[in-house]
Amino acid sequence: MKKIVSIISIFAIILSATQFVLADYSDDTTITDGQFAYKKGTNNILAYVGTTGICEIPENTTLKGLTPSWAKDAAPITKLIINDNVDINMIISGELVNLNKLKEVEIKEGVTEIPYQFLKGCNNLEKITLPSTIEIIDDEAFSECSKLSTLDLNDGLQSIGRYAFSETTLSGNLNIPDTVTHMDVTAFTDCGNLDKVHMSNNIECEKDKKYCYWFPQTDIKEINIPDTMLNCTNCYFHGEIGRASCRERV
């Protein structure tokens, strides 16, 4: 009987401590609900406070922060799942987002845009899963993700921003879908050793720019040159294939 009482007492103490930790995140402006701390009266997520390391952002929320210092008891995030209709509005620099343990990101169908500097500098990120609904990958979205070695881009993607995948370690083949019409300069700067690149056949020549190149300091063994680039004299390719205008390469 004493043993049962002792076990119940220990369980009660543990439960009480857990409740205290959760309550500690709630104050006049913050409330804890499940694995997240929210700004009171809103759907704004301020922090992940879960203990598994698998962070799944609920639908119809605004993501303002994930790892502030006051959420010190939360497990480091190793997998991040973004559901449909999530407004990603994080401050990347500083204490609000520290994702140095993050290895995998899965973005669900329905999300249409990857914002500026979304996961810049996540140097343990190895895998990203993008939905077919993604239309825009903004500037520096995955730059400096030094362990990211594979990338699958789906039909439906329209625009890739400046330095979007710079300083990654991509290898093998890279397919840039024919739905892509805009790819900003230096999108794939210093991003590994690529065997074969399929460039979108619908990339638009931006004649207002003095130069337009996408792969500086990236080694490429084989690449197609889209018909849209044949008369684009300010278009250059860098890397193993050398620096030459499209007109000169054809």
Model-derived features: positions:
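GGW-centered surface loops in extracellular recognition modules
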Residues: 30-51
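Intrinsically disordered, low-complexity Ser/Thr- and acidic-rich flexible linkers and loops
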Residues: 205-213
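Consensus positions within tandem repeat domains that build extended binding/scaffold surfaces
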Residues: 70, 93-95, 115-118, 138-141, ...
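Structural signature of tandem-repeat unit edges
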Residues: 35, 50-64, 75-88, 98-113, ...
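Positively charged n-region of N-terminal signal peptides that target proteins for export
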Residues: 1-9
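Bacterial N-terminal signal peptides
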Residues: 8-16
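Sec-dependent signal peptide cleavage junction
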Residues: 15-29
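Short, basic/hydrophobic alpha-helical segments
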Residues: 69-75
